């Protein structure tokens, strides 16, 4: 299945959308990881409020995502290289994983499936990233790279979060929207992702992402308007 582009915005319009929805994107990401946290708590943590009832590790996860999003938006025009991905993971998994900002160097398992991803090598990852750049459609390229990163498990932890941020970097820089899995659809996404891990079947997963997981704005180009002013 080939995913066509769902939205066509300018880069500045897409950055405006990403900034406006950043807390929602972070909330969906932490719920995807199974964290017991509410949207108001996520909002409060983002704005550095002190919360006694929230686990310290959960607070760290939210703040790491805040910093990772800041890195992506501040470096939106950089090419997606292994070094770029390592920098994003360094923000995502800081003080959470065995190591962060480096490729995994040991074996891991994935809950819910018998699939065991092989240990990644630098040469293999660089080669694969170059192959993705040959895909002309931005949404197709972003989703394919994201799913590959999730299944490959490049890191000890934070793989889904990092993969989705890299996908969003590509999507935003080309004005194609934002990928985020709404809380109400996380269970189905998990089932389809497990099926992909186990059997390498991804058509249903890609169709789901297109229908439920890509957000954007359709602008009336007939109306004259200025580019959104970025903070």
Regions found by a protein language model. Name each.
Residues 1-231:
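FIC/Doc superfamily catalytic core
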